[in-house]
Amino acid sequence: MLTLTSACIAHHTTILTECTTSASSQTSSLASLILPKIQHSTPQKLTYTHGTNHIHYIAESPSEHPEHPSAGGLTFLVIAESSLGRRIPFGFLFEIRKRFFEAFPEGSEFADMPNYGAASFNQDLRGLMVDYGTTAGGQNDAISTAKREIDDVRGIMTRNIEGLLERGERLDLLVDKTDRLGGSAREFRVRSRDLKRRMWWKNVKLMGLLAVVVILIIFTIVMATK
């Protein structure tokens, strides 16, 4: 099972390249809600928690790219199952950051790129997600990369996504969960109706049997008094 469910590289809110391995639409909606909240005034390495998902990202800053400030608006983001921890997702992020800058040098005009303007990188994203998310070798490479890049992933700030989003945005995130609950509720209602129908027929049969017994008793009494 893939434990890296969605990844993207964006310039501010413009998604340049993206890959989703999860059938759920919730993962991509998480990314679209997080990106507008990310500040690039200083470099950031941060994890947000949302249920069983963790949203990890590395946000560039113009201070890291003084000669190419456009690169300072980039965000490298991945959504992973919480069971994967943080070393593997951040190792993955450091690797895609390195490969992305190899394919698109810092001097590229990222601000002028349209949505999915770096879609040629999609295959690289998917390949790394599969490798780092499912293979022991890939996960070991990710951990080694994370150790090289950061001394201690526990130093990465972790926040709950609920504190980041406005109420309306939090409601948007419930849509996917509500759809699943709605399906379960419909199934429950169908089963409830079937159960009620069976109980009704059972009661009808019982009442019919009681009526027959009462009639037989009355008939017996009448015959005995003659």
Region roles according to the model:
Residues 120, 124-226:
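SNARE-motif-like long amphipathic alpha-helical rods in endomembrane trafficking proteins
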Residues 1-138:
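Extended N-terminal soluble domains of membrane/secretory-pathway proteins
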